[in-house]
């Protein structure tokens, strides 16, 4: 039999899902000549925040 080993999670890693709105907004972003603007119309299902529905497209 092989010896058992213990696996530990990396330091700083927490399981779970972060709200997308916490990570997508970058107020200091400067546009570039190569940036492309795309627009999507998203209608969230009942009970789904608009930001999270938009994250599914992003």
Curated annotation (Swiss-Prot):
The modification N6,N6,N6-trimethyllysine is found at residue 14. Keywords: Acetylation, Calvin cycle, Carbon dioxide fixation, Chloroplast, Lyase, Methylation, Monooxygenase, Oxidoreductase, Photorespiration, Photosynthesis, Plastid. The modification N-acetylproline is found at residue 3. GO terms for biological process: photorespiration; reductive pentose-phosphate cycle. It catalyses: 2 (2R)-3-phosphoglycerate + 2 H(+) = D-ribulose 1,5-bisphosphate + CO2 + H2O; D-ribulose 1,5-bisphosphate + O2 = 2-phosphoglycolate + (2R)-3-phosphoglycerate + 2 H(+). It is an enzyme of class 4 (lyase). InterPro entries: RuBisCO (IPR033966), RuBisCO_lsu_fd_N (IPR017443), RuBisCO_lsu_N_sf (IPR036422). GO terms for cellular component: chloroplast. GO terms for molecular function: monooxygenase activity; ribulose-bisphosphate carboxylase activity. Pfam families: RuBisCO_large_N (PF02788). Its main location: plastid. Residues 1-2 form a propeptide. The keyword Cytoplasm does not apply. It is found in: Plastid, Chloroplast. It comes from the Eukaryota. Its EC number is 4.1.1.39. The basic functional RuBisCO is composed of a large chain homodimer in a 'head-to-tail' conformation. In form I RuBisCO this homodimer is arranged in a barrel-like tetramer with the small subunits forming a tetrameric 'cap' on each end of the 'barrel'. RuBisCO catalyzes two reactions: the carboxylation of D-ribulose 1,5-bisphosphate, the primary event in carbon dioxide fixation, as well as the oxidative fragmentation of the pentose substrate in the photorespiration process. Both reactions occur simultaneously and in competition at the same active site. Belongs to the RuBisCO large chain family. Type I subfamily. Heterohexadecamer of 8 large chains and 8 small chains. PANTHER family: RIBULOSE BISPHOSPHATE CARBOXYLASE, RIBULOSE BISPHOSPHATE CARBOXYLASE LARGE CHAIN. This is Ribulose bisphosphate carboxylase large chain. It comes from Euonymus maackii (Maack's spindle tree). The lineage of its organism: Eukaryota, Viridiplantae, Streptophyta, Embryophyta, Tracheophyta.
């Amino acid at each position: 039999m092989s010896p058992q080993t213990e696996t530990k999670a990396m330091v700083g890693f927490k399981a779970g899902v972060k709200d997308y709105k916490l990570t997508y907004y970058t107020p200091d972003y400067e546009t570039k000549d190569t940036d492309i603007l795309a627009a999507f119309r998203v209608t969230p299902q009942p009970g789904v925040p608009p930001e999270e529905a938009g994250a599914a497209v992003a």
